[in-house]
UniProtKB/Swiss-Prot annotation:
SUPFAM superfamilies: ACP-like, NAD(P)-binding Rossmann-fold domains. The lineage of its organism: Eukaryota, Fungi, Dikarya, Ascomycota, Pezizomycotina. Residues 411-422 have a biased composition (Low complexity). Polyketide synthase-related protein; part of the gene cluster that mediates the biosynthesis of 10,11-dehydrocurvularin, a prevalent fungal phytotoxin with heat shock response and immune-modulatory activities. The highly reducing polyketide synthase Dhc3 is responsible for biosynthesis up to the tetraketide stage. The role of Dhc1 in 10,11-dehydrocurvularin biosynthesis has not been identified yet. PANTHER family: BETA-ALANINE-ACTIVATING ENZYME (PTHR44845:SF6), CARRIER DOMAIN-CONTAINING PROTEIN (PTHR44845). Its EC number is 2.3.1.-. This is Polyketide synthase-related protein Dhc1. The gene is Dhc1. Pfam families: NAD_binding_4, PP-binding. InterPro entries: ACP-like_sf, Far_NAD-bd, NAD(P)-bd_dom_sf, PKS_PP-bd, PP-bd_ACP. One of its GO terms (molecular function) is phosphopantetheine binding. Residues 161-322 are annotated as: Ketoreductase (KR) domain. It comes from Alternaria cinerariae. Residues 424-435 have a biased composition (Basic and acidic residues). The modification O-(pantetheine 4'-phosphoryl)serine is found at residue 72.
Amino acid sequence: MPKTPNGKLDRKSIAALLLRNAKRDMNGVVNDVEKMTVREGELRLLWERVLPTLGDLRLGPSSDFFMCGGNSMLLMKLQKAIKETTGIRVSTKDLYESSTLRAMTHCVFDRANRADDDAAPIDWAVETSLPASLQTQIQDLATSSPPEAGGHGTNGTEVLLTGATSFLGSHLLRSLLSSPRVKKVHCVAVPADEQATLFSHDTRIVCYSGTLLSPTLGVTPQERRTLEQSVHVIVHAGAHGHCLNRFDSLRAPNLQSLHFLATLALPRCVTILFLSSSRVVLLSGDTAPAPASMRSYPPAVDGKDGYTASKWAGEVFLENLVAHVENVASSASSPSVFWRSSLNVEVHRACTLVSESAPNSDAMNAILRHSLDMRCAPRLERAEGYLDFAPMESIVAKITVHAVEMATAVQQQQQQQQRQSQPPRDDAADGSPTERARGLRIAITLAVSSRPWATLGRIWRGRMVGDPKNWIYKSGL
């Protein structure tokens, strides 16, 4: 620090120091316009999640974790976030030795690349098959006595929801609570440090601490029995990762979590509503496919684009689950009363959801925001297909309606079966042999209109002349 001739701190000289230089030194950023790779950007999001508020400081490849406010405790929190997000285990020693964003990115993802080189090709038939424990449970339930009917009352619907603290899940939770027919929402697999974001003042919310990485999602045996007896519909909105993750790192949170939810649904054939991804349909090579099964279009066996692959695997697993239940129930000599109806499953592939509250990491919402700020539209010369946007509120309202209606239908059907103790008449037996027999419905939730890229660009530019923010966020695209 500058000093006076008397050896004291020179306050005037200190005040004249450029704050920008000091900020750059503290941040470890040598060049304000340093470009980041996609991997560095991915890790930066995790830094921003665990570090204290950075203010106007910008993280760059040369930023040092500890110079940006990090410490040993936050480094351990970052280590956990890396494991949960990417599935990569990295020691705190290696993270200490690679404290800049660029060095840490190489440390984490070079390790993953070496592991990927030794990985065997993925067998999708094995990945989407039913685990032996699940097959045993189905076989036992097919001939067992009916379970307790604690959840069959007529005083409202109880919903099991995963992903309640995510962008989509939080809006869906709010929508479910606004329905007068919803009695209670069981929020499962909520990380302990995110429970404060839930509406704790609402007594209809029951929170279960846990994570999708846990084989039981953190649910205790007693909590499991309660959920098996009470919930009427399971809405699986939770997921980890994105297209940069490999399937191996997302198998547990995105696919095996469905295995556990299936064990909860089976005793009373509780409806499962699975929120998949619109990217799954791209595996077919068709940019505007009909809402149908994608079983015939498996992902690549190298595990790349793991998020899409995990969602595809989840869809096909549910198809196999429903088919297996139907086969076992039809072959049982004296099936349980609850197994005389199909296990109902709905798969929803929602479009891009537009909301002013979307996180900065949401790429499409970020493009819309910057387009509004700059009053420019992106040039999409090589793009093909359609853009499907819709307001978040519109889509979650539709999902809520589907969830409540499916739960109500199952409640009424099972109440009637309890009274009559006779198999219900199947009026839809002549329907589609694939979709009807498996009790599976695939729904692609799209915006009101889908337009080709070129047409959409003209409409976009024209309507932005008026009130672009109102048009984008309230009316959908």
